[in-house]
Each structure stands twice: as C-alpha cells, then as structure tokens.
Amino acid sequence: MVHNGIIENFQELKNELQAEGRRFDSDTDTEVVAQLLTAHLERGATPEQAMGKAMARLRGAFALVALFSGRDDLLIGARRGSSLAVGYGDGDGTMYIGTDALALAPFTKRVTYLEDDDWVVIDHAGARIFNGDQEVKREIRLSGISGAMMGKGNHRHFMLKEIYEQPAVVGDTLQSYVDPATRTVRLPALPFDWNKVSRLTITACGTACFAGMVAKYWFEKLARLPVEVEVASEFRYREPPLPEGGVCIAISQSGETVDTLAALRYAKAQDQTIVSVVNVPESAIARESDVVLPTLAGPEIGVASTKAFTTQLTVLLAAAMDAGRARGVLSAAESARLANALLELPGQINAALNLEAQYRLISEDVLAPARDVLYLGRGSSFPIALEGALKLKEISYIHAEGYAAGEMKHGPIALIDEFVPVVVVAPTDALFDKTASNFEQVKARGGKLVLLSDSAGNARLASQAVAAIVLPKVDPVVAPILYTVPVQLLAYHTAVAKGTDVDQPRNLAKSVTVE
C-alpha cells in the first residue's frame, strides 16, 4: 500500500476492525486502509470490489495505490482530493501510476488524470477507471514535460538551477503575453468584461499568495480595480460573501494545492468567474477554471519555489495591464512603456544573477551566523520582503520575518540589536524616502543592515549598511520581479553555508495536496 494524504475517519474504522479481532502493527491511517481492504477480501470480495467498498467508507483527502498478494499483474489506485495520474507506455503495454505528469515524466508523456472519487484498475489488459460502481472514460493527455528537463545540469542543487533559469523562463512567458513588435499585452480570450468586474479576489497559499499580494498593488494602481488577497486555507472556511460579477484568480505552481482548489470551488459556487495562474495546464485547478493563464516555468523540482514565482508575477502584471487598458485607466503609451520594461527584465535578471559572489559573502558573513533575520519593504516590495523571509526560513531553518517597513515602529523595532540582520528591499521608487527613513531608524538602534537597491539608493544608504547590493535600475512597477532574485540567492547561499538540505527541506513537500 502506498498512500498520500489523510484518512479523517481512520480511528472510527480502526475501532470497527479491532472489534472484529484484527490486530494492528502501527498507528498509521495507511494501515487502516490496508486492513479494510483485507477484511473485504476475506469476506469474498474481489480486489476490485474491495476497493469500491473501501472508497465508500473512507473520508478525507488522499491518493492511494494497492498491490495485492498473489496478483502481481494487478494495481488498483484511488483518489479523493489529492492528485493521482495514470501513465501509458509507448506501445509496449507498460502502465504507470503516480501523483502527476511530473512524477511520470521519466517514463511517459501520455497521462490520464483521475477525477475525485475515481479508482483505477491496472492489469495486463490496460487501465479501467471507475467512479463509484460505474466505469468511466477519462481523456489521455500528452504532457509537455520530459524526463530530460528534470536534471540538475551543472548546478549543485535543483534550486540553484531553477534560479538561473529565470531569465529564460521569464522570457518564454513574456513571449506568450507580450507582443514585442507592438509592445502590447495579449491574453487568452476572457469570458468576462474587465469593465463589469466589481471586485477581484485572489486566492493562493505560501509563495503564490505573495505573488497575489504584489498583483493587488498592480491591479489597483494600473486598473483601479478593487482586489482582495485571500490565504486559501482561511478563505475556504471563512466563506465570505462575494460580489455579483466578481472574478477569482487562483494561483498555484502545481495546480493541485488542496486549499487553493477548495477555495476555487467555493468561489465558483458563488458564481465567480475563475481564472487560474498555474504551471501545470493539465492540473485539477486548471481543469476547473473558466480560463487558464499558464506560466511557462517548466518543471520546478526544488521544494522552495523560485522560477514559478517570477513567472507568476510576470503573468499577473500582464493581466493587470490588460485590465488597465480595458478599463481606460492605462493609456496606450503607458502600456507600451510598461511592456518595454517587462521585455527588458530577462537581461536585468541576468545582471542580478552575475552578482552571485556578493550574495554568497553576505550569506556566509551576515545571515548564516544569525538566529533571527528581518526583511523590510514598502509598497509592492513588502510582499518581496515576505517572500525573502519565507525562503530563508524554508531552507536554512533560520527564523525570519518580513514586515512592511512602516510597521517597524509598531512593534518589530523592539527586536533590533547588533545580532539581528535586517534586509531592506528598497528600489528608488515613490516610497524610497520613506523606506530610507526606516533604514536610518534601524541603523540608529545598532541594527545590521543589508541593502538591496539600485545605484541611486546605494549612493544614499550603502554607507550605513554592513553589506549592499547594487541592482539594475528598473521601472518601479516591474521592480518586484527583479528584486526577487537577490532574496532567493541570499536564502540559497545561507542554506548552503549551514549545510541544510536545500532541495528537500525538512517537513516540507513540493505540492501540498492534503490539509
């Protein structure tokens, strides 16, 4: 038995099975499923019947696969609320089963995704899929992911490889959303009119939620469109009222994030039009959306998201520009200027990557010895501060927090001393003077400041910092995309200095498919 997920009623089922005299060797919910299947088999059920009966009793979000003693030619898989896919070999009759197309990529590109409550029987005759007691047909899709895309290349870790792929994947994503000849944004046909959207709801988890927070600044500034950003795990249970004619954007790298999928379903039940920003077009979130805005990041193997985040930001900015043009807020000239700023980003990201030796020194000398690190930013740099703190804590296990710089005086400034590094994300935008004031307040209290800014920002503040990075000057609107790169590399080199598992941090999973 292979099982991913949670059986919510496992204790109830275990009590029933123990009352029948069955002995358990563990306290896991996985063994409860195995014992339940065995009980049905001993009552005369076939393996197929046993799985059907078990599915009728199990509650929770899970995917599972069972191999039966004496039936080496038989696999039975089932899913509810967690991804499971069947892979078809290239004409040789070989069958595979795994979580998604990425897991199956080394073996096949031909994939069928199971729907909720589906269970599949795989034997010498192929795959038969059932839902309840009815056999059903599911489409075989051709995945664009190949096994060759999943190596580390010449890099030490997948995360570092994926950080260095960002100029290319942001460029690939831009090719789908920005016409370089006309400097205009092109989105897929949308099933709604931006002028009739009363409110935009963005829902996501983790890093994807920070992408949504940046997008809030963009949609409200460029399109004058009210936006609420919701943590999916809270949104799905709070069940807030949603406006008539509203649009919900669901953001997920995998397209299988369980809380985001549940939030999407709630929004859909409230008659919201669903737009998804996903990296896997065949995923559950994509399949349940009215329109999909795919990122073109390619497979992301490292648990800590990097290139998926920057491509999500790229897509969301293109969408905000499209909304701004449609709503008459963004002029053609201003839109063309921003499109040009976007098209210049791959080269500017590459320039930021060329500073890697500086990131490594700062990480080794300033961040790695620390027990606590603060990140500060204002405006659209605030979510990048949050993302920087998340990256650091995810892979280096150093406690880190991100704050809006203006909130320092409301509590966090009490933490400042000579042992707490403070990383300040400070492009020279309209809020730079305010950020500089917060920077100087930290300095006055003995804080160890690390400055991320352009040449103008460094000219004013670098002398007060223990370390400073000079980034290319960019349009303030696109700055969050560029300034993501240094916080990623600071986290990466800190984790390497501390000797942690960069690609597989403890207690974390790449795709959170269970609550």
What is the meaning of each model-derived region?
Residues 195-344, 425-467, 490, 498:
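Glycine-rich phosphate-binding loops that contact phosphosugars or nucleotide phosphates
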Residues 166-170, 174-201, 291-421, 495-515:
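Active-site phosphate/pyrophosphate-binding segments
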Residues 1-152, 156-157, 161, 165-198, ...:
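Conserved short alpha-helical segments that host acidic/polar catalytic motifs at enzyme active sites
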Residues 31, 62-65, 74-76, 83-85, ...:
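Structural motif
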